[in-house]
Amino acid sequence: MQIFSYLCTNFRYNAMKNWKILLMAMISLLAAGCAGKGEWRSTKDQDKAPVTKPEITIEGGRLTAEGLWAMGRIGTAVADPETGRIAYTVSYYSVAENRSTTWIRICEPSAISNQPSEDGLRVIDEFVGSDPAWYGNSGVLAYMRGGKVYLRQDGKDKAISINDERIKNGELEGFLMSPDRKKIILVQQVKTVASTADKYPDLPLATGHMHEDLMYKHWDEWTESAPQPFLCDLEVETEGEFVSEARIQNPKNLLEGTKYECPMKPFGGVEQLAWSPDSKQIAYTCRKKTGLDYAISTNSDIYLAKGERLEANGEGSEANDINLTEGNMGYDQNPSYSPNGEWIAWLSMERDGYESDENRLMIRNTTTGEQRWLTKTLDSNVEEYLWMDDTTLLYTAVWEGTIQLYRVTLDGTTQKLTEGQHDLTLADVCDGQAYVLRHSMREANEIYRLPVTGDGLAGASEHSDNLVQLTHENKNIYDQVEMGRVEPRWLKTTDGKRMLTWVIYPPQFDSTKTYPTLLYCEGGPQSPVSQFWSYRWNFMMMAAHDYIIVAPNRRGLPGFGKEWNEEISGDYGGQCMRDLLAAIDQMKKEPYVDETRLGCVGASFGGYSVYWLAGHHDGRFKAFIAHDGIFNLEMQYLETEEKWFANWDMGGAYWEKNNKIAQRTFQNSPHRFVDKWDTPILCIHGEKDYRILANQAMAAFDAAKMRGVPAELLIFPDENHWVLSPQNGILWQRTFFEWLDRWLKAN
């Protein structure tokens, strides 16, 4: 996955490039089932009172770090076709206690009108939990809490009982019920590597990790287990319309005896599995590789399990499952059947090892095997999709700096349904209405509803007028602060092309004054500078500190065609860097930009950009900040865990002396240009970041100090590629602005 994406909403995905579930991954996954992995919780949260919505008074009318952490973070939303109710999740954080709680709210359909109240939806039930999924019977909601699955009805819970030692109740990570509600898939970790204690029982307190192959670490953990799906019989007893008992019987590991992952680490959820409408087939995503083969390949496939494989004592193993995507060498994932079962859809990338290849929406006829690429004319990436009916799908995609909603039929006929200065995440579709999460650089996630049926739908602009806001989660914050203005600018690159650049202005901007200005360097390296809302890289926070922010969609970012997106692999120090400099060079000519007070900031590949520009900026900048950035590309090639990414993006290994692309990449390693460093730099890193190891920041800091360059180092021993805990998040913000103010505002 990509190195970076602080697009805190769903997702997305992915700290390096991904499918935005990650990108929307920062708050929670968008499917009913797996617990979101982007939220931070203390290890003993279940023993404490749940965190509720904080009350906060913000002085001065400007957004603060404390204000950011007081915001409710809306994640999943699911609609019940039987009752019309909506269930959604919202997470609250306690800075004082350094922990969070995720709540589920159930809302009545009567509250969902074209004129919702200022308080948003009328809540009829609220409780602690995550991953809501409608059970499909008289308003029963299935959800997760504390690693267990519950059924909730009329404010009362019924835990699904499990009396089988093969299922670790309390450690479950996801669930997916069959349409007939007679079976359930439970996801749990299965041990795949013998521990030190297994080998030496007399050393139970030894902490060493022993490994004999690659992929021994992934994202922020040592790889000693794999998530695997257990198929179980589900027995539910009722008294009238009410659930009286629920139990699980006959668990069967669909990947028994293997080390394979399903869902795939580190961010996969139950969206990577799908039941057929008749409950007789399971389609699942799996990369059936281990060790070195796993580390160098993105070749996952969609497999089909059916017949005896779905029976408790049935014959056959995963080796008997049908590979529906055999021959496609890139990522294939996230299968979903049409309501009538005639088609199965999934997301697909073509090339092995290229995790940022075009993400295509594919369908396959379940009878004839005919395959179709539905988004062939899109020239961009599909983020997520849902079936609307038997012949129509909805999906979101990035184009020219925003993520919008589209509708496509089985013949590939596509209609753009929305436009505007926002990003949308598709949460659910029910009774001709799409439920989306909408956010922008000026507003965090809120739930909206949009009609999506009918042959005569209006154009995207008119259709966007039908977006109805259903929640107003953070109105109490917005009422106390003034947000800055966000403006799209099309700037000219050094090779004569047009580049979309977002310019963010401080609140109460005065064009007769001059402002310190920041060049924001995006990560990924192929994650778009869309209308994202982040709880660290928050442009409204930067604007609140009276900075202008220049955020270019440089070469290598999606949403501007395939050629633009791919003009970065093997050329880290090339046109993408010239694009960044072109953006700041043009903006500094504006009379309100103080060209003597320019800063440069970025994370992941953006951190690489900062380190590289520190040796090439020719005096433009007065301060740098790099978060989780690459300083030494040769070390990064060996240290990062997902070797496919290093191979593709760097063009090969540094010892391949006749490989011109690889040699060009490594010649542009920032550490080679330290002799030209002369500008103050702040280096930030998390020690649990196994995508880019923390020694990169330590080396950069040491190099600066040994060069006599003012530098500061902020290391988080317990954070990964992101900063997730509340107090660390505020420490990050304070350090960030203290450094910038010191060098860009001090007399």
Describe the role of every protein-language-model region.
Residues P109-S110, Q153-K156, L234-E237, K306-E308, ...:
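Short loop/turn segments that connect beta-strands within beta-propeller blades
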Residues W40-T52, T101-T102, L186-G257, T285-K288, ...:
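Predominantly five- to eight-bladed beta-propeller fold
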Residues M71-A87, V123-M144, D164-I184, Y216-P229, ...:
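Conserved beta-propeller blade repeats
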Residues Y92-A96, K148, K191-A194, K289-G291, ...:
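Short glycine/acidic-enriched loop and turn motifs that connect beta-strands
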Residues N10, P109-P116, G307-G316, G454:
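Arg/Gly-rich low-complexity intrinsically disordered repeat tracts
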Residues A32-G33:
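C-terminal motif of bacterial Sec signal peptides marking the signal peptidase cleavage site
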Residues T290, D465-N466, H472-T596, A603, ...:
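Cap/lid segment of the alpha/beta-hydrolase catalytic domain
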Residues N538, A543, A551-N747:
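Active-site-proximal cap/loop segments of hydrolase catalytic domains
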